[in-house]
């Protein structure tokens, strides 16, 4: 199983730069993400509608496709429990002031770390830079050729 943040989830459905590389990586394993990633993904699609990057019919089709995949179990949505929020508090307590870490990114990183993932895939430079503070590695395959991984390479303990 591999962990995607929202920047990668969006590329599974929308042809942003790097979408082909993200889709190729997704084809190598099952995809997991924090449960709040669903809301972030839908919000990103709505932003594209608001900004005129997609038309209303395409927006409706995107939402329908996402809903169908969610109902089919295409993703493993990871919940945030007390351990996740404890991890977030601990990281922020010792986080250097120079590190830019948004709350939603902290939720992704803590969720992944507490769920046993050792790698988070993202195209978000701030999230990637902060990953080490959660004891995990951030990777970006955009502009690279993804290498298929075995499930155990992504989970420390499942």
Residue ranges and their predicted role:
Residues 8, 43, 108-111, 127:
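Hydrophobic side chains within alpha-helical segments
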Residues 1, 113-158:
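Acidic, PIN/NYN-like endoribonuclease modules and their adjacent C-terminal/linker elements
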Residues 75-125, 158:
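Active-site neighborhoods of divalent-metal-dependent phosphate/nucleic-acid chemistry enzymes
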Residues 42-93, 133:
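Active-site-proximal, substrate-binding regions of enzyme catalytic domains
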Residues 33, 79, 140-143:
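Structural signal for conserved beta-strand scaffold positions within catalytic alpha/beta enzyme cores
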Residues 1-40, 44, 48-61, 148-150, ...:
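Short, well-structured N-terminal submotif of metal-dependent ribonuclease cores
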Residues 21, 40, 87, 129-130:
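Phosphate- and divalent-cation-binding pockets in alpha/beta enzyme and binding domains
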């Amino acid at each position: 199983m591999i962990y995607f943040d929202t920047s990668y989830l969006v590329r599974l459905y929308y042809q942003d730069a790097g979408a082909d590389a993200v889709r190729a990586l997704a084809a190598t394993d099952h995809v997991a993400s924090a449960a709040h990633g669903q809301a972030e993904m839908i919000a990103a699609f709505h932003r594209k509608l608001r900004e005129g990057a997609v038309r209303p019919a395409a927006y409706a089709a995107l939402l329908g496709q996402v809903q169908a995949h969610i109902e089919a179990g295409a993703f493993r949505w990871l919940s945030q429990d007390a351990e996740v929020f404890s991890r977030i508090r601990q990281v922020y307590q010792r986080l250097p002031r120079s590190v830019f870490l948004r709350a939603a990114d902290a939720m992704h990183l803590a969720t992944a770390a507490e769920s046993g993932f050792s790698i988070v895939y993202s195209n978000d430079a701030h999230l990637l830079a902060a990953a080490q503070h959660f004891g995990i590695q951030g990777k970006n395959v955009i502009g690279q050729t993804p290498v298929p991984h075995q499930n155990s390479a992504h989970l420390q303990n499942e």
